[in-house]
């Protein structure tokens, strides 16, 4: 049954207890209020699965949300409603978003600074998968690493989401990239 069409108005993928086999994860109802000041309510159209999502369900990630929590770090959706003092977005806008948890739901309420407009060239699945990986690569290479054109960057695990984003960003900056992966097939990505 598609999300949002169940007996409850909103549905979410909840982690109700930590486990090594996802046995503590189940679909269930989600009660969402209206967006408050500076917040937006989104109808989620796609969400991306990241390795930290799985680590959180085992209690092994650096951020440990209180149980129960809705899984998911990033997604793409349509703005349904805006709170007071939100001026950059309007209902109907298609946006990508990132959050500490909560993306695996039919709808989500977030601060407006957690969303960004999506270029028309990206479909929903592509837009859902870029927020966390691209931001992680950017913070690592540009803000923290201060990577410059002409420098050389070694990217271990270049076939994963962050690795792919790091390779693309480093090339865009003008750096020379040396990439590693666990197999030749992955290097050909």
Q: Predicted segments — roles?
A:
Residues 20, 49, 62, 102-103, ...:
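Short alpha-helical
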